[in-house]
Amino acid sequence: MPGPYRAILYKEVYYMNTFTLKGTFLDTPAPDTLRVREGYLLCENGLCAGFSETAPAGVEVLDYTGKIITPGLVDLHLHAPQYSYCGTAMDLELLDWLQQYTYPEEAHYADPAYARLGYSYFVRDLKNSATTRACIFATLHTDATLELMHQLRGAGLSAFVGK
């Protein structure tokens, strides 16, 4: 599994420079192929460096035997300012929902302190999820959008951010 997959599974894993994960690895090397392998994944500087059936010598092994390990997920459509009320009022039609929840909430992001706090929860939870890359919608407020980008970078997450 060499490639640009981020080796972010748990907080303790993210901060280590070189380590090996032991477990059951699931990936799709081709669109019609699901591959399941037992073994070891060597991770160096946050990137997957190679897969082996044996543990590399001299490298700490994090044992996740019985756990499924997958490459990070990519979210292609994510609205960061809507995070605080996701799942709210699911019975409303879209336009009603936008008018009652989205537009009033996004107006608060004109306040830099509000944006900083709101995005901190979003980024924290995104980092602790299986999502390692994303296309994220912010608000029309430039300073708030820059704050989101700053927080994503600080968390080590890769994203395209727009409004």
Tell what function each PLM region has.
Residues 9-56, 67:
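N-terminal metal-binding scaffold of metallo-dependent hydrolase/deaminase domains
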Residues 26, 79, 139:
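Catalytic metal-binding/acid-base residues of hydrolase active sites
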Residues 31-36, 45, 54, 64, ...:
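Domain-wide signal for the mature, well-folded portions of proteins, strongly enriched
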Residues 74-76, 134-136, 159-163:
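Hydrophobic faces of well-ordered beta-strands that scaffold small-molecule active sites
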Residues 87-157:
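Alpha-helical scaffold segments that flank or form the walls of functional sites
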